[in-house]
Amino acid sequence: MIETVLFDLDNTLLDFDRAEHEALRQTLLHLCGYAPEEMLRRYNAINRAQWKLLEQGKLTRHEVKLRRFALLFDEFDIRVSVKKAARQYEALLGIGHYYMEGAEEVLKTLAPCYGLYIVTNGTASVQQGRIGSAGLRQWVRDIFISEEIGFDKPNPAYFEACFARIPGLQRQKTVIV
């Protein structure tokens, strides 16, 4: 019988793609005065590639945050501060939350019966902001953010650190969604 459920945050509970798109669109509009869909799509590809490099240990989290904008701005010949863009984008992303369809109802239903936890990669300030603005803390017992844990998913060390912080965890009675 299942007792513990670990939910991934991005695109499981909250629609990260939508929040990312809106934060990027607002950042580009503010700093550049325009935000064409082509540029937004290209950012997504560049950003995913940078996070893959982080997971492979080839970049640091700080490098990812800046490099994704540096590459985008070089490609589109934009002369805007990469650091300023990264700061504004993260601030906007930190308040952007849109529930995935049915996620809120699932949490409300499961919370009284199971130990619910959030497991997520990402920047602590952004993820904490999104979790807080979405009101997710009311349903979960703890939140495990890779930047705070010191390892990124899917590294087994990340999950070992999470499991060690869950009182009385029985792995055979635990699922990850």
Where in this protein do the model-derived segments appear?
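Short acidic capping loops at alpha-helix termini that bridge into adjacent secondary structure
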Residues: 81, 138-142, 170-175
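Substrate-recognition element of Asp-dependent hydrolases with the DxDx(T/V) motif
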Residues: 84-87, 92-96, 103-134, 142-148, ...
